[in-house]
Amino acid sequence: TRIERLERQAQQWHLVDSQQTLHGPYDQVIVAVPPAQAAPLLAGVANLVAPASNSSMEPGWAVAITLPQKLDSSADAVFVRSGPLDWIAREASKPGRANSENWVLQSTPAWAEAHLDDDPAQIVDALVAAMGEVLGIHIPTPVFQQAHRWLYARPAADCEWGALAAPEQGIYVCGDWCLGGRLGAA
């Protein structure tokens, strides 16, 4: 169910969905969505709508692959930040992960923007080829592959809104766009 707006009535919040169904009442609401989706929800809360309206996000493609054998590369993670690739990581090098040859590939925002509507299989092919170039080795055909497009992958600029809240109204906002583009900032 997609919530389209928040309404404050008698010191409580009601959520209105795309079918105009009313949900609630709620004493408090936490808005944990990208700024483009948060701004319309926060329209009635002046000190919260401005940060959401003035923040933008960049897209990204993430690809997960499993290879049939271990790559002959000492690299476990590489910040590439050029061409199609921003980051590649060997998952088995992380504590507590499976020993299979799983990799995560993340695109640069500019490349993702240029390829937003491409077929996911084409995205996998392009990023795997770029990975081979970065590592300087042949990458065998993956036995598993999956691509996911993130329209709102990370903040377009560094931001330091910090905690966004109107506690007197019982509304709180969180997300990486409030403090920075990495998981810990969310």
What are the residue ranges of the model-derived segments?
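Flavin-binding catalytic cores
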Residues: L71, R97-N102, S107-L151
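Generic structural signal for small/hydrophobic residues in well-ordered secondary structure
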Residues: I30-A32, I65, L105, Q145, ...
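An active-site-proximal "capping" alpha-helix that borders the catalytic cofactor pocket
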Residues: A185-A186
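A conserved short coil-to-beta-strand element within the FAD-binding core of flavoproteins
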Residues: R2-H14
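Short hydrophobic/aromatic beta-strand or adjacent loop that forms the aromatic wall/cage
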Residues: G60-A64, L85, N102
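Central helical "cap/lid" subdomain
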Residues: L22-D76, I137-P140
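Short, solvent-exposed loop/turn segments at secondary-structure junctions
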Residues: E4, P35-A38, K70, S93-K94, ...
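FAD-binding beta-loop-beta segment adjacent to the flavin cofactor pocket
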Residues: A92-S100, F144-V173, W177-L179
